[in-house]
Amino acid sequence: MSRITTSLDHYEVWFLTGSQNLYGEETLQQVAEQSQEIARQLEEASDIPVRVVWKPVLKDSDSIRRMALEANASDRTIGLIAWMHTFSPAKMWIQGLDALQKPFLHLHTQANVALPWSSIDMDFMNLNQAAHGDREFGYIQSRLGVVRKTVVGHVSTESVRDSIGTWMRAAAGWAAVHELKVARFGDNMRNVAVTEGDKTEAELKFGVSVNTWGVNDLVERVDAATDAEIDALVDEYERLYDIAPELQRGGERHESLRYGAAIEVGLRSFLEEGGFGAFTTSFEDLGGLRQLPGLAVQRLMAEGYGFGAEGDWKTAVLIRAAKVMGSGLPGGASLMEDYTYHLVPGEEKILGAHMLEICPTLTTGRPSLEIHPLGIGGREDPVRLVFDTDPGPAVVVAMSDMRERFRIVANVVEVVPLDEPLPNLPVARAVWKPAPDLATSAAAWLTAGAAHHTVMSTQVGVEVFEDFAEIARTELLVIDEDTTLKGFTKEVRWNQAYHRLAQGL
């Protein structure tokens, strides 16, 4: 059995330095020392989330090829950073780059920040040649079609480290998705289009394994939950949440809370034993379950599991990726759904929620644990956590299957405080203003065919999803403060042509 984690501690990124034997041993020793110093600065920086491992200077084609193959074979290695300290003839890199299957970042930097004007001689010029050595390297990457992120500047600069750290988080998300198994309990909500998708293509494209289990396989685990396991969870609920009086010990509906805890015990047992990192449920396919899972889903998402409602495995994958990519950062990531609008001119905003399953990592407050009727599903009233999402910057991201490819759409948003309390709304919720404005955002979202289920992340911004999509060679459309509907519509049309051509090539 394996416990879920979002930690990046078991991952590493290799730091590669290119040169050639032409320079001689003394210069190559300087190259090694200075590249180790660059790697050390990255490794010790608090804003670099993944361990950086320096590798010996690469000087010939065979060593480069072997390094790429070693990286491919290492489960710990989630990507490579390369820098051409001197001039490294790029034909030496062809076999290695062609074989490489890991995310790649080209760091265009140099050892020194300022030029030592009064002492510069030809020895200095020969040693510090990244300004044109990296141009040679950039050419061969483009010639080979290598997908990479290019970062320019000295590693002592915060913006440079931020870009590298963001790419590392995207690479970690990519690694997590590649080892991800998704358990679907039942199938999609009947007749819904956007939650469907090609699971075989997803395994080829993203590495994720998506399969279905009968809901009653889960029911067996729920029914097997012991009183001791349930008691332990109820104790935890009492520590963490404000429990409604009727659900408290001795309350008239306390048994409903205990059954909610049994669902959590059973779900966690099933997921851990199967090595799953994400799951879906459907209110139309509940088998012997007495409640639609709500509280259990919320708490498992908070631990790092991906989740999709109504069989939506694509959103479950995105949420798991977002959880890993946001590891260690304040905020959270959750299933979200655009529900209804506030359309007062000048005040336009969106009220988002779901039936039950919003992750409590979106709040720093103390959620209330409540029970209310649910008009669909035909089961007992489910227990759930109720709270308001913390105000602040966020991004909402969706994935759609566009037949010949997957499309990711991201909207930059600002979560805002509620205008008034919502005493009669019995679910967790968020209110946000989308960029650039609601009308443009919604029209662009509809134009893109983006899904109604999203992941909302308050931990990471849109750049990490841009890097993730680039690594995955997957279409990404961004709606932000610079978006115009006219320009966005053109981009959608251009993308259709580009991605179809790219697949053919």
UniProtKB/Swiss-Prot annotation:
Annotated Mn(2+) binding sites: 310, 337, 354, 453
Cofactor annotation: Mn(2+)
Assigned keywords, A-Z: Arabinose catabolism, Carbohydrate metabolism, Isomerase, Manganese, Metal-binding
Annotated source species: Clavibacter sepedonicus
Name of the molecule in the record: L-arabinose isomerase
Catalysed reaction, written as an equation: beta-L-arabinopyranose = L-ribulose
Gene Ontology MF terms in the entry: L-arabinose isomerase activity; manganese ion binding
Enzyme Commission designation: 5.3.1.4
GO annotation (BP), single: L-arabinose catabolic process to xylulose 5-phosphate
GO cellular component, one term: cytosol
Cofactor note: Binds 1 Mn(2+) ion per subunit.
Origin superkingdom: Bacteria
Family of the protein in this entry: Belongs to the arabinose isomerase family.
Role of this protein: Catalyzes the conversion of L-arabinose to L-ribulose.
Organismal lineage: Bacteria, Bacillati, Actinomycetota, Actinomycetes, Micrococcales
CDD domains assigned to the protein according to its UniProt record, in alphabetical order: L-arabinose_isomerase
Pathway: Carbohydrate degradation; L-arabinose degradation via L-ribulose; D-xylulose 5-phosphate from L-arabinose (bacterial route): step 1/3
